[in-house]
Every structure is written in structure tokens, then in C-alpha cells.
Swiss-Prot record:
Transmembrane segments: none annotated. CDD domains: Tm-1-like (cd15488). HAMAP family: UPF0261 (MF_00677). It comes from Bordetella bronchiseptica (strain ATCC BAA-588 / NCTC 13252 / RB50). Pfam families: UPF0261, UPF0261_C. This is UPF0261 protein BB3289. Belongs to the UPF0261 family. NCBIfam families: PRK02399.1-1, PRK02399.1-2.
Length: 402
């Protein structure tokens, strides 16, 4: 079969960003790369783009009329979906470059997020100097701040856009080069600072046989790992640090989404999980902790991070929440119960040590997980950071991944 020539897809709302898009197209063509320009404007006006807004909008499940509504908010949401579906249908996407303000960024980045990790994605945006998590999510999108508004060419915007063109062209070429692969299958492992010793022991034990990909459990970390599982890129998962559930249920700043564990259920990938750092909810600096939580047991982890100890009632709730999702998993699942504590702070003499709270978590798991030959809870009578726990996790993983 003849190899399909890859191209850089350049997406912009041509009714407001056409001048900048054409400037980028010229730079990329001068650099010798093939470019496909795509108009994602919701105004319905004509443009010189190679792919018209009408063609993109037609990819919406309800047709172009769902996009060209005349109402900005709903039109952006609809065009974002249409562009995501359009891009997913193209077989020659070698990289994606987008430019835009808040609307254009919200419109282009969902399609970028849907692409596999490793396909270069660069968004030049007025929003890139703030909180970019809603745009980047679990993907490898690179965000470049436009400095000036994306509203015409000037000496600043020309330089920034020229740098963007050079960056995406370089990434496009590099992505086509083979990278070293020693043949070891990849496993995903979740970690937090307070479960680091556990993960270090696990990765040391697995290193010879597996390429260990460690994800920081910051909300997007878990999403990134599950995105790889959904993409079939992981041979197994050791989800030892499920702390993102605390933040999701109790208002922390490092929350997962409601789809946590969803990729495990969908993919059936061999899964070893545990209760790492389910004793804490993450907030920012101490003065950012919600007023309703100020009288709780708080621990300043550093000047930027304040931790709140979960209660027995909260632990029972999150144990039931996790159990309900584990029950959806039909692949091989082992969920380990570290009876000696779930984090470095949850140990004798440490700030969050609370046997009753931990017992409520463990009991909720026992009460709600429907255990089968393929889905089992495993008692481990030691602390999560004890080398014996890591050994148990590795043994369970080897058992289910043979």
C-alpha cells in the first residue's frame, strides 16, 4: 500500500484571522512542508481556505444547520464538534497548527485533544498565559502565547507567528523520524509525592520487562494515562495513586473527571489499583481553602499546596464511588488495600494518620465491589510505601498480565 503523504493542518476562523492564517501558510510552504488550510469560522462567509467552513460544518451529526445558527456560543460548540469529526476523518494529518482568541481556541483544541499523543499540536492563542488545562486536557498540545491580540499583522505578531511556523514544521519533521524502541511493553503507573517510595519500588521491579510510564496524579495526569489506555498503547496499568477521586468528590483543585476508570472498563487492560493518597483533598495556598473547610484538619504541603484530611464519612463515599466504577470493569482487576496507611502522611506519628477513617474507606470497598474470579480486592497488611506492598502490587500485576 502506498504511504499517504502527511500534511500540516492549519485551522483558523478566516473571517477574523484570515490574514494571519495566510501569513502562516506562506511561511510553512516556504519551509517546504505541505499545508492544508481549514476555515472554522461560524459566520458562514466565504474564504480562500482550502477547506471551507461549510465543508467542516457538514461533518456535524446534525449537519451544517446546527453550526450556522447565528448564536455565537452554541455555534462555537457545534463547530468544535464538526471540526473534531472532520479532522478524525482525514488520513494525512501529520500535525495541527491553530490560531485564535478565546473562541478560536475553544473551537480548535477539542479536535487536537482527540488526536493520538505524538501527533504535533500547537495552538497560538491569546489564552495561553492563563489556565490552559481546559484546552490542553490530557493531551500533548503545546500552547504559545500570542502576546498581542490575534487581530492583524504587526511587528510582534509576525515574529510570534513565524516562530510558531518554525516550531510546528520542526515538530512535523521530527514526528516522522523513528524513535528508539527496545520492544518492552508500556505500563502506566500513577504517583503522588506521598506515594513516591511505593512507585519507585514498583518501577525498579518492573523496569527490565516493561517501559514504566509514571503519571503525576494531578487530575490531568490520570486522564493522560487513561487516554493512552483507550488508545491501546498500554499493556497494563498500576493505578496505585487514585487521589484525584478525593478532589473530584470534595471540591479539590486536582480533580479527575466522572470518567475516571472509564478507560479501564472500555479497554479491558490488566489493572492493579490501590488507595494511594485517598486521605487528602488538594487546595492551593492556605488562604485559598474554602471557608467551609477552614476548621478541618489542614496540612501545608508547601506554600502553594494545602492538603485537607478526608473524614470517615467522605472515605466511605469515595470507596463506594470507586467500587461502582470497578464493577464496570470486565478485564482482570486487582485492587489492593494497604491496611497500614495510604500515604506518607497517613502513618503512625504523621499528620493524617487516622485508622478509623481508613477503615471506613476499606469497608466501603468490601461492601460495594462485586468480587469475581477476574475482579478481586487484595488485603496487604502493611503501609502503601512499605517495600512489601510494592512487591505485592508487582506480583499481582505479573499474575494477571501473563
Amino acid at each position: 500500500m502506498q504511504e499517504i503523504e502527511q500534511r500540516i493542518y492549519l485551522a483558523a476562523t478566516y473571517d477574523t484571522k484570515g490574514e494571519e492564517a495566510e501569513y502562516l501558510r506562506q511561511l510553512l510552504r516556504r519551509d517546504g512542508v505541505m499545508v492544508v488550510t481549514v476555515d472554522v469560522a461560524t459566520s458562514g462567509q466565504g474564504s480562500p481556505a482550502m477547506v471551507s467552513a461549510q465543508e467542516v460544518a457538514a461533518c456535524h451529526p446534525q449537519g451544517a444547520q446546527a453550526v450556522f445558527t447565528g448564536e455565537r456560543g452554541s455555534a462555537i460548540v457545534a463547530m468544535a464538534l464538526a471540526f473534531e469529526r472532520y479532522l478524525a476523518g482525514q488520513r494525512d494529518v501529520g500535525a495541527v497548527l491553530g490560531i485564535g482568541g478565546s473562541g478560536g481556541t475553544a473551537l480548535v483544541t477539542p479536535a487536537m485533544r482527540a488526536l493520538p499523543v505524538g501527533v504535533p499540536k500547537l495552538m497560538v492563542s491569546t489564552m495561553a498565559s492563563g489556565n490552559v488545562a481546559p484546552y490542553v486536557g490530557p493531551s500533548d498540545i503545546a500552547m504559545m502565547y500570542s502576546v498581542t491580540d490575534v487581530a492583524g499583522l504587526n511587528r510582534i505578531s509576525r515574529r510570534v507567528l513565524a516562530n510558531a511556523a518554525g516550531a510546528i514544521a520542526g515538530a512535523f519533521r521530527q514526528a516522522r523520524q523513528p524513535i528508539a524502541d527496545d520492544g518492552r511493553p508500556a505500563v502506566g503507573i500513577t504517583m503522588f509525592g506521598v506515594t513516591t517510595p511505593c512507585v519507585q519500588h514498583v518501577t525498579a521491579a518492573l523496569h527490565d520487562r516493561y517501559d514504566c510510564l509514571v503519571f503525576h496524579a494531578t487530575g490531568t495526569g490520570g486522564q493522560s494515562m487513561e487516554k493512552l489506555a483507550d488508545s491501546g498503547l498500554l499493556a497494563g496499568v498500576l493505578d496505585l495513586t487514585t487521589t484525584e477521586v478525593c478532589d473530584f468528590l470534595f471540591g479539590g483543585v486536582l480533580a479527575c473527571t466522572d470518567d475516571r476508570f472509564g478507560a479501564i472498563a472500555r479497554s479491558g487492560v490488566p489493572y492493579v489499583g490501590s488507595c494511594g493518597a485517598l486521605d487528602m483533598v488538594n487546595f492551593g495556598a492556605l488562604d485559598t481553602v474554602p471557608a467551609a473547610c477552614r476548621e478541618r484538619l489542614l496540612y501545608p504541603h508547601n506554600p502553594q499546596v494545602t492538603l485537607m484530611r478526608t473524614t470517615a464519612q467522605e472515605n466511605a463515599r469515595q470507596g463506594a464511588w470507586i467500587a461502582e466504577r470497578l464493577n464496570r470493569c470486565e478485564g482482570q482487576v486487582r485492587f489492593l488495600i494497604p491496611e497500614g496507611g495510604v500515604s506518607a502522611l497517613d502513618a503512625p506519628g504523621q499528620a493524617f494518620y487516622d485508622e478509623a477513617a481508613d477503615a471506613a474507606l476499606f469497608q466501603a470497598l468490601y461492601d460495594h465491589v462485586r468480587q469475581t474470579d477476574r475482579r478481586r480486592l487484595v488485603r496487604v497488611p502493611c503501609h502503601i510505601n512499605d517495600p512489601l506492598f510494592a512487591r505485592a502490587a508487582v506480583e499481582q500485576f505479573h499474575e494477571i498480565s501473563q
